[in-house]
Amino acid sequence: MDMITLFGLALALAMDAFAVALGCGLTLERLTGRHLFRLGWHFGLFQAMMPIIGWLAGLTVQKWIETYDHWVAFGLLVCVGGKMIHEAFQDEETRESRDDPTRGMSLIMLSVATSIDALAVGLSLAIVGISVWFPALIIGIIAGVMTVIGMLLGRRAGARWGQRVEIAGGLILIGIGLKILWEHTLGM
């Protein structure tokens, strides 16, 4: 695989991570270096691991994964997006104690949801006989960088527009989930 194709693939895979990070940046009261590192590291790591897992699985589980991957991504994104919208309507005291999307189960759910497409890429690489190791590294690095950029842009917008942007962040996640479901069920 040539470098231009690889970078194009990595950027395409990073778009979901970027959009989700944008939504996360919108919801955080105060964005710290730890938030940036945690989300960037996890999204990058999951984006790098999933092609490797898909490549190792090869053809044996391809049909099963293709049948359910979009439902898993949809469910995870709708749950987290719905939670973000719900939290936007809470009073100020409750909002301060809410879950941080860069920690715990929210972090794991978002990491899995944004990297499922990379699993399919790994399967595809196995089918055409391309080694996965270098592409996985590039995919992970670009996803991590795009995640940090998304969080920074989201935080900037969140500081300016507050609750409305927080609701938009949840709607973005739900929209991404619906897009994934739409593309996979209708084959678009």
Curated annotation (Swiss-Prot):
Location within or outside the cell: Cell inner membrane
Family designation: Belongs to the MntP (TC 9.B.29) family.
Its job: Probably functions as a manganese efflux pump.
Its membrane topology: Multi-pass membrane protein
TM helices/strands, residue ranges: 3-23, 39-59, 65-85, 104-124, 125-145, 167-187
Keyword annotations of the record: Cell inner membrane, Cell membrane, Ion transport, Manganese, Membrane, Transmembrane, Transmembrane helix, Transport
GO cellular component, one term: plasma membrane
Pfam families tied to this protein: Mntp
Gene Ontology MF term list: manganese ion transmembrane transporter activity
The name this protein goes by in its record: Putative manganese efflux pump MntP
Coiled-coil portions: none
Protein species of origin: Syntrophotalea carbinolica (strain DSM 2380 / NBRC 103641 / GraBd1) (Pelobacter carbinolicus)
